[in-house]
Amino acid sequence: MPKPHDNDHMPFPVLVGDIGGTNARFWILMDAHAAPKEFANIHTADFPTIDQAIQDCILDKSGFQPRSAILAVAGPIKDDEIPLTNCPWVIRPKAMIADLGFDDVLVVNDFEAQALAAASLGRNDREPIGPLTETSLNSRVILGPGTGLGVGGLLYTHHTWFPVPGEGGHVDIGPRSDRDWQIFPHIERIEGRISGEQILCGRGILHLYNAICAADGIEPVWTDPADVTQHALKGNDPVCVETMTLFVTYLGRIAGDMALVFMARGGVFLSGGISQKIIPLLKSPVFRAAFEDKAPHTEMMKTIPTFVAIHPQAALSGLAAYARTPSSYGVKHEGRRWQR
């Protein structure tokens, strides 16, 4: 009978998976030193279950039989059946062990995987935002504006990295400047409040764009966040430019808040496709100015480096780092790991 298990080591080969709402991504690690065997992204809508997707696209095509699986998922991990956010798949670790031949299955939060990546990304996998280019062995934070706003902490103590998942994307965000006070009344509230995720995600770009249009009494032109971003980068639509300037400002504010919470002297990392697409905007003075504007701690904030994670598979990289050297990380297993 599969059961929760507390031993750190997971036997190789190990399948690592990053399961999102639209795509699932997988690598197989044959041992602790070999380069990962990579596979094409799987569209979750193409398969009724994750088990069938793994069987058809990974096991049958590769000819490998992993002994372990480490899966990062967007959704609460509460019991033996783990429903995913924005995807009809359900993770059933016991069934995976019985039907797919695994001996060991560990399921973690998606931003735990991103936090693990923040501990292991090399210089070529991160783009500095601002004048500071080096990290240090200190606590870190990773934020990812995407479908929502993910936030993860990474504490460093006793020579070990401890990922700290949470719901930091749902902290309050409010107006500070005169322009903010004009715009914020037009942003949709959830039960009377505006959280970071209402603005700092894909749909949040559109919320912000529409609020600016409403504040200025003009008709919106664009209905796709990608269009707003594209025209801001080109600089050919002033409303789009203001939208993304404010997006970067608010992202800097929240990133600075999270840096203070975790005392993230080791760096703050921005992950995901949106962050990668808007690197030119993030490199403007706006982001760092908002990030550092945390009186009475402005001088300290100037010493904290900020980066965009540009590794194409950052979450898988983080999971792989953990699989190879589990003793370097303090990853909770209780209630999240099952063994044959």
UniProtKB/Swiss-Prot annotation:
Entry keyword annotation includes Protein transport: no
Top-level taxonomic group: Bacteria
Keyword Glycoprotein listed: no
Localization terms from the record: Cytoplasm
Record-linked InterPro entries: ATPase_NBD, Bacterial_glucokinase, Glucokinase
Disulfide bonds: none
Catalytic activity: D-glucose + ATP = D-glucose 6-phosphate + ADP + H(+)
EC number: 2.7.1.2
An example Gene Ontology biological process: glycolytic process
Sites where the protein binds ATP: 17-22
Keywords assigned by UniProt, alphabetized: ATP-binding, Cytoplasm, Glycolysis, Kinase, Nucleotide-binding, Transferase
Principal location: cytoplasm
CDD domains on file: ASKHA_NBD_GLK
GO CC terms: cytosol
One GO MF term: ATP binding
Record-stated family: Belongs to the bacterial glucokinase family.
NCBIfam families recorded: glk, PRK00292.1-4
Protein name: Glucokinase
Organism whose genome encodes this protein: Allorhizobium ampelinum (strain ATCC BAA-846 / DSM 112012 / S4) (Agrobacterium vitis (strain S4))
Lineage: Bacteria, Pseudomonadati, Pseudomonadota, Alphaproteobacteria, Hyphomicrobiales
Gene assigned in the entry: glk
